[in-house]
Amino acid sequence: MNINEVINYAKGXNLDTIEALLILELILKTKKELIIANIKKSLTKKEKKLFFDQIDKIEKGIPIHYILQKKEFMGIEFSLNKHVLIPRFDTECLAEEALIQIQQNGFKKILDLCCGSGCIGLSIAYYIRKKVILSDISTKALQIVEKNTKKLKLEKFVEIIHSNLLKCIKGKLDIIITNPPYLNKEELEIKNKIKKEPTKALLGFGKDGLNISRKILNQAKEKLSPNGLIIIESAPWQIKSLKDFAIKKGFSHLKTIYDLEKRARALILGQRDDTSIRNCTFNQDK
C-alpha cells in the first residue's frame, strides 16, 4: 500500500486527511508537506503495521492526540499524555481574556489553577513574558508542565507548585485562571466511553459537578488581592448556578465569556462591585 491508499483507509475509520497525515508524521518522522509530495510512495511492512495499530487504537476510543502526544493551543504546540486533559479550542477564550485583563490591569501575581498540561498558564507566559504560577494536584500532570516549560524555554517565567487547589499557594493573587474538573458522574460515564481521558481531571463531584468549582471560589475569596479577578470555566448549562453561588459568596459578576459558538463558557468574577477601580471596561452580563 502507498501513502495515498492508507490515508483513504483512515478516512474509512472516520479520520480526516489531516489526522491521517499527523499519524504518518509520527511513524515516518517526516513533515506532512514531504509526505504529501510523495503521496504515491509505498510503505514498508513495518510502517503499515504501525499505521494500522494507531488506527485500531483510535477505533477503540483512544483520542488521536494521546497517540500523537501533542496538541496545539493558542498557536503553540504542547506535549501531553494520558495523565492530562487534551487542550480544547473552547478554552482558548479563557487564555485570550486573561491576557487582556493582565495587560490592561498590570497584574503581576498570576495563577493557572488546575493547570493540567499547562496550556493556559504557559500561553500567558509565552505571549507576555510575565511570571506565572502553575498549580495542580496531580504530580504526573506537573511533570508534563515541566516538560512544556522547558520545551518553550519559559523556565524563568514559570513557578510550578504541587497543591490541592489553593492550599499551598502563598500570598495574595491578582488573577486566578482556572479550568477545573466540572463533569458530574452521569456526564463522566458518557464521556469516558468516548474519550478515555483521566477521571481526576474531569470529575467535579456533586450532583451538578460543581463541588470543586465551589471550593475554588470559597478559597479564592481569601487569596485574591482587593482588586483581584478570577476567570473560571464551566459547562454552558452550569454557568448560571456558578454565577449565583459566586454572588452569594460576595463576588461581583463582571462578565460572561462566550466561545465561538456563542455558548457561555466562563465567568470573570471580581472582589469588588466597583469596577471603575480597574483600567478596563466590562460588559455587564446579568
From Swiss-Prot:
Alphabetized CDD domains for the sequence: AdoMet_MTases
GO BP terms: methylation
EC number per UniProt: 2.1.1.297
Keyword Methyltransferase appears in the UniProt entry: yes
Gene3D superfamilies, sorted: DNA helicase RuvA subunit, C-terminal domain, Vaccinia Virus protein VP39
Molecular function GO terms recorded: nucleic acid binding; protein-(glutamine-N5) methyltransferase activity; protein-glutamine N-methyltransferase activity
SUPFAM superfamilies, alphabetized: S-adenosyl-L-methionine-dependent methyltransferases
Pfam families reported in the protein's UniProt record: MTS (PF05175), PrmC_N (PF17827)
Highest taxon, organism lineage: Bacteria
Binding site for substrate: N179, P180, P181, Y182
Catalytic reactions of this protein: L-glutaminyl-[peptide chain release factor] + S-adenosyl-L-methionine = N(5)-methyl-L-glutaminyl-[peptide chain release factor] + S-adenosyl-L-homocysteine + H(+)
This protein's UniProt keywords: Methyltransferase, S-adenosyl-L-methionine, Transferase
Family, similarity comment: Belongs to the protein N5-glutamine methyltransferase family. PrmC subfamily.
NCBIfam families in alphabetical order: hemK_fam (TIGR00536), RF_mod_PrmC (TIGR03534)
Record function comment: Methylates the class 1 translation termination release factors RF1/PrfA and RF2/PrfB on the glutamine residue of the universally conserved GGQ motif.
Name of the protein: Release factor glutamine methyltransferase
Encoding gene per record: prmC
